[in-house]
């Protein structure tokens, strides 16, 4: 056991986590040179295309140190985006230490801080590493000072390396062996294994990634899942090197995968504890705190025949992504679907893309909303995650919207632009600290504003230098209203949105103008209206197509023309009474773009 080292690699987006993982694998001989590919751990197509890590991946390597001993290194490569912070915290729970990778050119950024604090809270040993020292812009001295000043860990002795060229990678490995403590645990105690991650394999059923805290797990053992109480036989187990390799036993402190032939998606939830069916452990390990979704959106299959497949796909995906929440929902305009909860907009995009690719579905998404706390006149409090569930205006005492605490790190030159943006998003400044050339500002901004396009706008006003980390702070009373969209006087439930009273007029006007572009012209006028309650705040009309009925009159009496026009008008009126409007997919997406341009 004293030769095992478990650690995660944490860093801000694009500071070189996955590349460093590649080097570690290569140096330790986990893969032959032929099998080596750039970012070998980012195995999803989506990850490769976007160049980001979405899922944490674990690898077990053997490393012969300079003292002649062979160490087993279990490491987990983690994502860097705010939306996947939950993946990071789960990975950290399986480790004793973390490598904090910082780009020697960029310096400390917001996610570096957030992830580092998560690691420190879990009592992990944090080892700072300065990466990308081969860049002409690299300034390791300045960055080491920044780490000490902003993060507050000793960094003057930090290992310097370049993951791309391979300089200093040996020092990193030596550092891991010397600085990160060996796992604690009792090999003779009853088995306790923590499920860090699970995914669904069409042939094997549920595959779980586990960290053995106490005891050991062997092939053909009978195990019990503690939350459900079900027992299973272990069919196969092993480690990732990063390929799946079968072994016969997982010992205390090791990280590996287990297949028990579980076919039920809810059979082995993430954060659960496995123990032996006979003489097992009495109490489970402390799991992970459940994360609450921040953004909700309706997802509907384009053709209603796909509903069953869609439900299965969501189930399989939620096994793999523990932060996804879903419940059935039906809409008059879109039929049956699900209301899904996500951690942020990037998470939502990724989930939608994974559903469309991996499960071959066509989906319509409704506008994302956040959760509002509504106090009703009868004294009850309810939580509303969709505009359709908002009670009637007379029944509402007050609506409270979620406020998020945003920590932004930005170079001093762009401070003005960033503050202007925060104020425009109804933000309230909490704190501002200068660290050399970097400024750390803290704002309380309504979640609804952050979720929509705050991140994109922040990047563009600061030329990409600002970085953001946000988390939910509290609910605060606010003047929110629901804007309904009416087509020819009928409400379209899927198009409603909740917005602040001050912005309702502009949002309503932009929305109807945008919708007008997407709805095809019909044989009769289509009135698109935005309304708050019974009060119409904006309107635009898609004009009818009409035949020129008086073309055949050459000269002649005016009453003849009037008669023909009147007849046409009556026909149009009759048509309008029975005609209904088909909404194209683009019209639903129009809401997403309101206020962007």
UniProtKB/Swiss-Prot annotation:
Biological process, per Gene Ontology: positive regulation of translation
InterPro entries linked to this entry: EF-4 (IPR006297), EFG_III/V (IPR035647), EFG_V-like (IPR000640), EFTu-like_2 (IPR004161), G_TR_CS (IPR031157), LepA_C_sf (IPR038363), LepA_CTD (IPR013842), LepA_IV (IPR035654)
GO MF entries: GTP binding; GTPase activity; guanosine tetraphosphate binding; ribosome binding; translation elongation factor activity
CDD domains: EF4_II, EF4_III, LepA, lepA_C
Binding site for GTP: 14-19, 131-134
EC number: 3.6.5.n1
Role description: Required for accurate and efficient protein synthesis under certain stress conditions. May act as a fidelity factor of the translation reaction, by catalyzing a one-codon backward translocation of tRNAs on improperly translocated ribosomes. Back-translocation proceeds from a post-translocation (POST) complex to a pre-translocation (PRE) complex, thus giving elongation factor G a second chance to translocate the tRNAs correctly. Binds to ribosomes in a GTP-dependent manner.
Identification of the protein by name: Elongation factor 4
Species assigned in the record: Vibrio campbellii (strain ATCC BAA-1116)
